[in-house]
């Protein structure tokens, strides 16, 4: 068992005081904290977030431009065409994307992310994405992000020129655990796309899914590997086992473990936006979600996710209002 006072005191001086994230061995200590120390961890993580990121919460909506039929075998994902999943391939048109962006903006969101279930975009998808970004920017006061898989240098340039300001490509899990989650591509391929995105001047968004069977050591490894990306945003998902996938029978992550992970990720990345994403409703519930927002989280996806239901948007907005958490206002470009 870790020396609780020692590791939290170290984090208080190193992270809160100096803005330097914890290393892997220190994060392992955080992830092994006893349950009774979770409130102290959450309070410290909240202080770190307020000092280094500010008090605002960024709200985002996401939509799937192309759902299902993906050729990859990510074991957690019901959009893979390789598994006996109920999800079937569906494409949205430009008008539907614009309308979804308008509805997202009405919630107070400043970010709208267009997602496609593909290994990487072909010319048809790239053209449609460019058209969608242009249409949304004409009609909606919102930033547009994208997540359409692995990219070539030419595709990265096209998206940056189209006005995509942030690109999501999740590392998903620790490098050492990745082969147990995906076999049709490598962790290094994902990392290379993120390098290209950063070089093109787009903001890097990369996170993953916790509770897939990784060890605490691998969870700490993952946090450090994400920190090395210097990402603008890290979305944290918790496994929501999907019928028909290889991980369908995996148990849900314990809520206490999820809170420890949130605290650890904040202490690893004091300057990074850390976003609540899929699975929080099942893993944490309403009370745990509130603890997370007061324990290091400073961004949230509202509404539904790609293939799973989220909480009603109004419930999340009411929760943030009750907790007196101000929403980020979209910065105007003049």
From Swiss-Prot:
Q: What class of enzyme is it?
A: transferase
Q: Name one GO biological process term.
A: biotin biosynthetic process
Residues annotated for [2Fe-2S] cluster binding in this entry:
113, 205, 275
Q: Radical SAM core domain location, by residue?
A: 55-280
Amino-acid positions noted as binding [4Fe-4S] cluster in the UniProt annotation, renumbered to this chain: 70, 74, 77
> Where are its TM segments located?
none
Its biological purpose: Catalyzes the conversion of dethiobiotin (DTB) to biotin by the insertion of a sulfur atom into dethiobiotin via a radical-based mechanism.
Its subunit composition reads: Homodimer.
Please report the name of this protein according to its UniProt entry. Biotin synthase
In its UniProt entry, the species of origin is given as Corynebacterium efficiens (strain DSM 44549 / YS-314 / AJ 12310 / JCM 11189 / NBRC 100395)
This protein's gene is called bioB
